[in-house]
Amino acid sequence: MSGRASSELLLVGSLPAQSTDEALRAGAELFGDLLFALPDGETGPRAAWVGYERERLVRPNPDVDVVSETVSPTGIPRHAYETPVFKIRPGLAAELHFDAWPRIDDAIASYGEFRALRDEGVIPAGLRFQVGLPFPSSALNGFKADFAGDYPVAERAFEDLVGRELVRLLDGIPAAELAIQWDMAYEVQDIEGVLAWTSEGAWERFAGPVARLTPQIPEEVMVGYHLCYGTFPEWPMYEARDYDVLVRMANYAVANSGRTVDWVHMAGPRYLRSEDKRFFRPLTDLEVGDTRVYLGIVLPIDGIAGLRRRHATASRYLDDFGVAMYCGFGRQPGADGTQTMREHAEVVRALREPA
């Protein structure tokens, strides 16, 4: 493997911590020698992933109407059918416009904490700062009322926003210290055909932004893709038949990003399919060159024995890969965050030893 990402582990994004400082300190202590980049844990409002975009980006836009609110008694959606529904305001004379992306403000602020901890020696020198950014279909998942009419307009506005905000992100974080991960869950489910509110064109909703957005990121920045089936409210939102869809998406992303793709992360199966050769067999069709592949086969329920089973099955079809959780693991109810992270690190390190 001659690419820039060669580490054993990828932290997908969210961590079970209460603050950025706590996440960065724990991440550095427990995983520092296993990683090429460290995320800020996506704590606070960002723990809801694209719920953050629904509430902080889309809802405040004066040209967006709220068609319906969540029916959840707590006011917090419990699943995808309980999220607020949005529609572009009728009679909008011009294109939709988003002024700024609050997630970029958070990333720049978190980098300040990252840099301070690195200067103190808490974070190992050489680790990049990892920023996860949702792809358009995921960020704009609330436009359900008239998806066919509204989504293309919202997508253009969002892509314009991303182009402007990537410039601002790079003004705040040195390119050589940055790793950007495009996060996709709704895109994957859209291609699988399980989102009832979407329309024709699922593949293009993934492929178009790959070719339009990723080339805007300078080569000095490391870039990866996280391909996932979602954890809202539980893993997985939809159980895939096999790795075929994610392999096709990974191949396309690497071939059409207009620049180096340093890594791809592909979520794995449930534990009962740890030795299901049919699930893993499409890995033989991966054509990603030096791009580092991380398989999301670390599960919190069956420890090193389960990871070894899945690793052995995957190794029948793929020679060299790193591992990760199937998604971020900042939203595991009832689990002690520090212990969850400690167990995660122990399981991955145990993979170094012979079975």
Spans of model-derived segments:
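N-terminal basic, low-complexity leaders that serve as flexible interaction/assembly modules and, when applicable
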Residues: 1-77, 350
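Structural preference for beta-strand elements that scaffold enzyme active sites
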Residues: 2-12, 33-38, 126-132, 177-181, ...
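Well-ordered, non-membrane alpha-helical segments in soluble/globular domains
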Residues: 20-21, 101-117, 151-166, 199-213, ...
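Active-site-proximal, glycine-rich beta->alpha crossover segments in alpha/beta enzymes
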Residues: 76-174, 179-205
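Active-site-proximal beta-alpha loop/turn segments in soluble metabolic enzymes
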Residues: 137-148, 183-199, 224-239, 265-269, ...
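Aromatic-lined glycan-binding groove of carbohydrate-active enzymes
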Residues: 206-290
